[in-house]
């Protein structure tokens, strides 16, 4: 299965040590990725101004350019907005720029985090957590889409993911055995 179960997500986040130099950033970054489903290039391409207002409040939406240069707006839930605040706080506390045009995700050298480095850091935490599941930004995308499909319609999931066709979205929705049982139980009740 290409999604993280809540217990796996907690295990992954629990191995990120807050005392490590980039631990707070990495925890907020992974949380943000899981709650937005953004692609790796979309995450790494974010500037502070994409997610924060000029008044230093997290935005309700983030506008990203996806595949095919299609622009879409992704709503930020309360957990994603808190992750934004944590990322900006981390940058400020480490002396990284927090102006609107500054990269949200930065390296030790104050440069934009490359997508390869993003994948590497996620892999490092996956190994530390001893998860037996592939863990990439795309796994987080599948996780978000699958969770969203449990509480919203497929057209909503399609729009958030930025898909042109509903058939593309269906690949991202994963059903667990517990969901199948619950669905059949609801059928019996109707």
Regions found by a protein language model. Name each.
Residues 1-190:
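Conserved catalytic core of the tyrosine transesterase superfamily
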């Amino acid at each position: 299965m290409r999604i993280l179960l809540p217990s796996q997500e907690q295990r992954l986040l629990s191995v990120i040590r807050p005392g490590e130099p980039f631990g707070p950033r990495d925890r907020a970054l992974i949380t943000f990725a899981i709650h937005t489903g953004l692609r790796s290039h979309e995450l790494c391409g974010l500037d502070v101004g994409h997610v924060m207002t000029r008044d230093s409040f997290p935005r309700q939406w983030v506008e990203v350019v996806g595949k095919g240069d299609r622009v879409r707006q992704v709503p930020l839930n309360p957990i994603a907005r808190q992750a934004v605040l944590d990322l900006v706080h981390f940058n400020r506390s480490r002396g990284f720029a927090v102006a609107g045009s500054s990269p949200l995700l930065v390296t030790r050298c104050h440069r934009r985090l490359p997508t390869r480095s993003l994948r590497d850091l996620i892999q490092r935490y996956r190994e530390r957590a001893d998860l037996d599941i592939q863990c990439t930004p795309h796994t987080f995308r599948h996780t978000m889409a699958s969770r969203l499909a449990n509480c919203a319609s497929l057209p909503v999931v399609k729009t958030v993911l930025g898909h042109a066709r509903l058939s593309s979205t269906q690949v991202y929705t994963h059903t667990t055995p517990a969901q199948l049982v619950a669905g059949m139980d609801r059928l019996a009740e109707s």
